[in-house]
Amino acid sequence: ARRTSCVSNMKQLALAIHNYKDAQKVIPPGWQKPADLTNFGYGNYWGWGTFILPFTEQVALYDQIDFGHQWLIDSGVNKGISATQLAGRCCPSDTMGLINTKRNNNGKSNYLGSFGNKGINNTQYTTSTNRGVFTENSKLRFRDIIDGTSQTIMLGERIGDRGNYKAGVWVGVRALGNGPECTVGRGPGSATNIVNTINGSNAWTLSVSNHPGGANVAKVDGSVAFLTNSINVTAYRYMIQIDDGQVIPD
């Protein structure tokens, strides 16, 4: 039942992303880094999980946000916004609850955008064969998903209740490259540097769950699939990348 509920959550988020895309003509960016950083001194950038709030029955919360200032849980014009608990962002199999106690008590999200196969750090690439759907200021169109919307992973799930896994937060990113609160996760790695599998040990992994045998992912077309722990790692890597042109092996 918990896995079924998780699938439903992911489908609703994928639908919200599609509705955002219909309204704005682009997929929401992984996070938005403004040109003027005067009010963003800590690198607290609003992310895709915030931008889709109006499409998940959270218009009132969205309307409280001053996007000209960063998010901070304890100070500033947006004080407290990031601590809002959103049940639809959390997998019921993660016993941590709706607040991410490993991420400064911000509102938890088990559902992360697919960043790509490179490490997440302060140099955020915008063109690469390792690129995923959600990067800095990305704003992709479906036509940019060269490998096909039914073949490309858009969202994964990451738990926070065991090991070094810290789940995520729905609001955005912070202090990139230094153990940030984060709304994105990474795939298995490049061809020469495989660091993750499904339920792999890397803390940045996109896909780790308490569901027996694997984890759920949502693809760009809105469908949800269950990827097993034994998935071909090359296939998983190709599913993360939006434009590598590779045929996904069995």
Where are these regions (language model features)?
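Surface-exposed loop/linker segments characteristic of extracytoplasmic
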Residues: 2-250
